[in-house]
Amino acid sequence: ALVVTGFYIPKAAQPAAETDGPLGALEVCMALRAIGGDAWLVSDECCAPVIRPSALGFLPDDHVLIAPNANPKGGFDAWLNGVIDLAKTEHIDTLVYIERVGPARDGSPHNMRGIDITEWTAPLSQLTLLGLHTIGVGDGGNEIGMGRVEDYAIEGVVDHGENIACTVPTDQLVVAGTSNWGAHALVCAMRALGSNAVDPYLEPTWQERVLDVIVEYGGLDGVHMTNVATVDGLEPDRYFKQVGQLTDCARS
C-alpha cells in the first residue's frame, strides 16, 4: 500500500507538519508489514523535515517517498511517474490517505481556518489516477476521501465548510474524532480479524513513543500550533484513553 499523510501548518511560529496523521500513517505501515504485506509512507517536501526522520526509525529509507511541490510542475510530474512505475513493479494495490488535505471546489486545498495552502501542499490527490483501491481517513472535512460526503455532511456543519470541503472521494472513508484514531481503528480491524502480529502497534506505549519522536523533529499540535506531544488540542489522557478503548475492543 501507499500510505499518504502530512498536513502542513504554515502560519505557526515554527511552521511544520501536524502530529495528527503521521502517527496513524506509521501505525498502518508497520501493521501492514507485520502481517506480510508492504507499505510505503508518502508525503511532501514541506512536511518532510518532520515525517522523513520520524519514519526512518521504523521503515527502510526507500519506503519513505517525498513529493516535490507542484512548482515547478515538471518536478512533481516526474515524481508521480516514478511512483506509477513503483506501483507496477511492486504490485501495489491500495492507496490510503490519512489526514491529507485535498482540493475543494475551487481546486485548492484549505486548512480548517479556511486558508488556501496550495503553496505548501503537493497535489498528492493525483495519486488516485493510479487506479488503486482507495481509503480515506479524516476528521475535519477538508481531507482526501471526504468527497464521498462533502455535499451533505460538511457544508454548514464545520466552520468554512462550503470553502474547505474536499471534493476528492475514496472507495472507503473513515471519519473519526482525530485521523490518528481512524488509522488506529483500521489496525484494530486487522487484529479483530485475527492478525495478532499487529499487537505491538496497538499499545498506547508504542503510540506515545512514536508521538514523542514526531514532536522531537518539530511536529505541531494542529489546534494549538505548538511543538508539544498532543494531537488536535486533546489532553494526553483523553487522547490515549480512546486508543486503549479501541485496542481493548479489537482484542475482546
Model region roles, listed by residue range:
Residues G141-S252:
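C-terminal functional extensions of proteins
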Residues L2-A17:
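Short glycine-rich His-centered loop
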Residues G37-C46:
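Short internal beta-strands
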Residues F7-I9, R100-P103, G140-G141:
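Short glycine-rich anion-binding loops that position phosphate/pyrophosphate groups of nucleotides
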Residues I51-T128:
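An acidic, phosphate/nucleotide-engaging active-site surface
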Residues P15-G36:
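Histidine-anchored nucleotide/phosphate-binding helix
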Residues G37, L129-T134, N142:
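A short helix->loop->beta-strand "cap" motif at the edges of active sites that frequently abuts
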